[in-house]
């Protein structure tokens, strides 16, 4: 958000100061989660020079055209609003309550499925970003099992993928 308000500048300066790392930092403020997510995807694509973005079943990301492409649920959000932006690929969510192998195997099995699908169907070298809600609210308040998010983060780091 480009604005001449000192309060915005102060918040961005505080974010930069509190964010770990010694490199040059920039902060941006947006008016909605959808706008923030669209910009995160643009930044990831520009930074990685890749186009593919991985999202998950049951996810809700917003009501803009780009975030509707990322949203899993057709009704009531997407019906009649297409065509949507390309290069979004949906993966199964680690959903302990409904995972076929049961909750105790969910993290490991779901991570294996997601990584296999990315590596074999997309190619990790094509993926700019993986977008995951830490707790999916719209999908039924799905809390991924311990180890799933950490495993995705490690996969992203290994392959130069931005984890949003």
Residue ranges and their predicted role:
Residues 45-49, 69-78, 147-151:
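A glycine- and small-aliphatic-rich helix-loop capping segment at beta-alpha/alpha-beta transitions
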Residues 111, 124, 142-164:
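Catalytic PLP-binding core of fold-type I/II PLP enzymes
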Residues 40, 131, 163-164:
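Generic enzyme active-site microenvironment
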Residues 60-135, 143:
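PLP-dependent aminotransferase-class I/II
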Residues 22-25, 48-52, 84-87, 125-127, ...:
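Short coil/turn connectors at secondary-structure junctions
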Residues 30, 56, 133:
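Conserved residues at the C-terminal ends of beta-strands
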Residues 1-51, 62:
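Glycine-rich loop-to-alpha-helix module at the N-terminal edge of alpha/beta enzyme cores
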């Amino acid at each position: 958000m480009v604005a001449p308000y000192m309060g915005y500048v102060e918040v961005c300066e505080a974010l930069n100061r509190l964010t770990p790392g010694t490199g040059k930092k920039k902060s941006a403020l947006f008016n909605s989660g959808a706008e923030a997510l669209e910009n995160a995807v643009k930044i990831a694509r520009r930074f990685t020079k890749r186009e593919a973005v991985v999202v998950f079943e049951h996810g809700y990301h917003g009501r803009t055209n780009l975030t509707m492409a990322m949203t899993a649920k057709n009704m009531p959000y997407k019906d009649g609003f297409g065509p949507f932006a390309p290069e979004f690929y949906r993966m199964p969510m680690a959903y302990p309550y409904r995972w076929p192998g049961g909750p105790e195997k969910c993290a490991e099995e779901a991570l294996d499925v997601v990584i296999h699908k990315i590596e074999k169907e997309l190619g990790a070298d094509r993926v700019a970003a993986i977008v995951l809600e830490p707790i999916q609210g719209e999908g039924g308040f799905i809390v991924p099992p311990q180890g799933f998010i950490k495993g995705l983060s490690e996969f992203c780091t290994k392959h130069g993928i931005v984890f949003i």
